[in-house]
From Swiss-Prot:
Signal peptide from the UniProt entry: none
Protein keywords: Hydrolase, Metal-binding, Nucleus, Protein phosphatase, Zinc, Zinc-finger
Residue span of region Disordered: 179-201, 349-374, 519-538
EC code(s) of this entry: 3.1.3.16
Keyword Transport listed: no
Source lineage: Eukaryota, Viridiplantae, Streptophyta, Embryophyta, Tracheophyta
Source organism of the structure: Arabidopsis thaliana
Name of the protein this chain belongs to: Putative RNA polymerase II subunit B1 CTD phosphatase RPAP2 homolog
Ranges of Low complexity composition bias in the record: 349-364
Function: Putative RNA polymerase II subunit B1 C-terminal domain (CTD) phosphatase involved in RNA polymerase II transcription regulation.
Pfam families in UniProt: RPAP2_Rtr1
Length: 735
């Protein structure tokens, strides 16, 4: 036990000496005193740590290591001394003198530490370094290692409940101990506020559609109040009481036609269409059953609970506009007290419509007034908790007639595009009346036809009109509700939503004319583009067959697509563009004038030679000639050709003169240029330089270095030698 304690004390003392030597500079006496305790490995550790700290490894030196340390190698061989020096060892010292002194001191140290040492001498050595350690005969290991200070504390406040992961490990969004503000309470408050706002404005959705001019959907909360006079019946005898009622109309978009109409109304005091008379009639209780039937019909229109208001314009000779709005429903407590209230206002009278006929004769003939009419039925539901009252249906209708003898104006009425010019013109008048008014039935229909025909009863006409209008309103409301839900949910945009709902938006004729003119201009530009190109396309490929929009299946590349050709594909494409009919004539020993014989060889088309203007072809030829000249000597060496390089260069230059050099020079490597030179020499060996033909078979070394196989080489060779090496026995001209 005593030996173990002494060993621990010695190791602790050596560690303190190492720390002192690392941080401070020692003197000669301290260094020799430390030699009694430290081993050679302990000192080497000190040298390494000092070198890492950019200090000289020798403890007696105070200088720093040089910054420009040579990193040429790990060892250096000295031919003068016949020795090998470790450069990593010399890099730990500032000079050769410190290296020698450190190695001398390290050689004087013992290999291992001594474990038997007197405690008195140990304290004397430590005193030299400014630190004393009282070493006793029986050392307390627990005290020296501070083990006696360890304490174990038990947490008795742990509850039996399970803690969440966030409470146990802390918040997941904490950054370096920062705990963010707890937003759970504020988020709950905001959610409650949002829900309350949604409950308030849940019914404030208004949709307005006018076909075929404008399609608009607006969702805006009402912010303005408008005071409207409601004519309310007190008893069934026709007495009326005027009562002010505050109505909150929803905000909706207004088309350009409506804005012009409102402007004319403010200017002339009329509705812009010649209607200035107004007559109000109050219905008694006797028509409540009819009102209930109308209410059921409008409930079947497909309007949702959001208060969808829809308007439709028909062009069947006369116009009918539906405008239905629904106010927010009452709460559940006042549901029994909710009553349907409304007004029936009939705008009747001989209203005039001014305008000139769109079908006027250009030769000076008199314009014939065209009869047209428009009927607007407005049904409004008021679900408010008022006192017990009557259920009143509010309906408005006005008639507009175009009469030249009543009123004249410069206003032009748009003619329906679906109406045939030679069709029979109808004039129908629908009047809503009271039974006590003495004017006949509840609904009176008068038909004024230009030609006599079979007359229908009022009930039949009403059934036909109601069925067509109900079908139109139901289909329109269903389509609009689907489109509005799709747009409000964010699943699709307006165009996709209308397409899915079955609504087709047709552009105006002016827009179509602009698109047609743009297409014609684009076609003219595409026809003129080939004459403006400075770099022509590949020879042998007509320009009209490439990427035709109407007759081609080519499409733009997808995103991230990168087309990379192999070395063989790039070489084959280059040779295919270079070789012309003049090249084949030169290869097979013919004159330049005989190049027309090689325009079509074995079904392959070889175009005429193309020379670019502005000297671009000559520049391309010089670039290719330089690349061939650098690769030619290596090919001659591999093939062992017994011929001068100058003669080969002359033949290659003559071959380049016959080629169509129109595109940029491909970025071939040296190994690929070797294959190009080999192909050209193989072509010249047919008739121009036949002496090198036996040596072409030594091509394996060149092909192996470039990665081109024999089959690929033969494929490229077929471009230069389509008739083979013996042209007199080969088929020609497609035969």
């Amino acid at each position: 036990m005593a030996k173990d304690n002494e060993a621990i004390a010695i190791n602790d003392a050596v560690h303190k000496l190492q720390l002192y030597m690392l941080e401070n500079t020692t003197d000669q006496n301290q260094l020799f005193a430390a030699r009694k305790l430290m081993s050679r490995s302990d000192y080497e550790d000190v040298v390494t740590e000092r070198a890492i700290a950019k200090l000289c490894g020798y403890t007696l030196c105070q200088r720093f290591l040089p910054s420009d340390v040579s990193r040429r190698g790990k060892y250096r061989i000295s031919l003068k001394d016949h020795k090998v020096y470790d450069l990593q060892e010399t890099s730990k010292f500032c000079s050769a003198g410190c290296l020698i002194d450190s190695k001398t001191f390290s050689g004087s140290l013992q290999e291992a530490r001594t474990l038997e040492f007197d405690s008195v001498k140990l304290n004397e050595i430590l005193d030299l370094f400014g630190d004393s350690l009282e070493v006793k005969g029986s050392l307390d290991v627990n005290k020296d290692l501070d083990l006696s200070k360890l304490m174990i504390k038990e947490n008795f406040g742990v509850r039996g409940e399970e803690l969440s992961l966030e409470k146990w490990m802390g918040p997941s969004n904490a950054v370096e101990g920062y705990v963010p503000f707890d937003r759970s309470k504020s988020s709950n408050d905001s959610k409650a506020t949002t829900q309350s706002n949604q409950e308030k404005h849940e019914m404030d959705f208004t949709s307005t559609v006018i076909m075929p001019d404008v399609n608009s959907v607006s969702k805006l909360p009402p912010q303005t109040k408008q005071a409207s006079t409601v004519v309310e019946s007190v008893d069934g005898k026709g007495k009326t009481v005027l009562k002010e009622q505050t109505v909150v109309p929803p905000t909706k978009k207004v088309s350009r036609f409506r804005r012009e109409k409102e402007k004319e109304k403010k200017t002339f005091g009329v509705d812009g269409m010649g209607c200035a008379q107004e007559k109000t009639t109050v219905l008694p209780r006797k028509i409540l059953s009819f009102c209930n039937e109308i209410e059921k019909d409008f409930k079947n229109f497909g309007f949702d609970e959001m208060g969808l208001a829809s308007s439709a314009m028909m062009s069947d000779g006369y116009g009918v506009e539906y405008s239905v709005s629904k106010q927010p429903q009452c709460s559940m407590e006042d549901s029994l007290s909710c009553k349907l209230k409304g007004d029936l206002q009939t705008l009747d009278g001989k209203n005039t419509l001014s305008g000139s006929s769109s079908g006027s004769n250009t030769k000076g003939s008199k314009t014939k007034p065209e009869k047209s009419r428009k009927k607007i039925i407005s049904v409004e539901y008021h679900a408010n908790s008022y006192e017990d009252g009557e259920e009143i249906l509010a309906a408005e209708s006005y008639e507009r007639h175009k009469a030249q003898d009543v009123c004249s104006s410069s206003e032009i009425v748009t003619k329906s595009c679906l109406k045939i010019s030679g069709s029979k013109k109808l004039s129908r008048s629908v009047t809503w009346a009271d039974q006590n008014d003495g004017r006949g039935d509840l609904c009176e229909v008068r038909n004024n036809d230009n030609a006599a025909g079979p007359s229908l009863s009022s009930n039949d006409i009403e059934d036909v009109n109601s069925l067509s209008r109900l079908a139109l309103a139901e289909a329109l409301a269903t389509a609009l509700s689907q489109a509005a839900e799709a747009v409000s949910s964010g699943n699709s945009d307006a165009s996709d939503a209308t397409a899915k709902a079955g609504i087709i938006l047709l552009p105006s004729t002016h827009q179509l004319d602009e698109e047609v003119t743009e297409e014609h201009s684009e076609e003219e530009m595409t026809e003129e583009e080939p004459t403006l190109l400075k770099w022509p396309n590949k020879p042998g490929i007509p320009d009209s067959d490439l990427f035709d929009r109407d007759q081609s299946w080519f499409d733009g590349p997808p995103e991230g697509f990168n087309l990379t050709l192999s070395n063989f594909a790039v070489m084959w494409d280059s040779l295919f563009g270079w070789v012309s009919s003049s090249s084949l004539a030169y290869i097979y020993g013919k004159e330049e004038s005989a190049h027309e014989e090689f325009l079509l060889v074995n079904g392959k088309e070889y175009p005429r030679r193309i020379i670019m203007v502005d000297g671009l072809s000559s520049e391309i030829k010089q670039t290719i000639a330089g690349c061939l000249a650098r690769a030619l000597p290596r090919v001659v060496t591999h093939l062992r050709l017994p011929i001068a390089i100058s003669e080969l260069e002359k033949g290659l230059g003559s071959l380049l003169e016959t080629m169509s050099l129109t595109g940029a020079v491909p970025s071939f490597r040296v190994k690929e240029w070797l294959v190009i030179v080999l192909l050209f020499l193989d072509a010249l060996s047919v008739s121009r330089i036949p002496r090198i033909a036996p040596y072409i078979s030594n091509r394996d070394k060149i092909l192996e270095g470039s990665g081109i196989g024999n089959e690929e080489y033969e494929t490229m060779k077929d471009i230069l030698l389509p008739l083979g090496r013996v042209p007199q026995f080969a088929t020609r001209s497609g035969a």
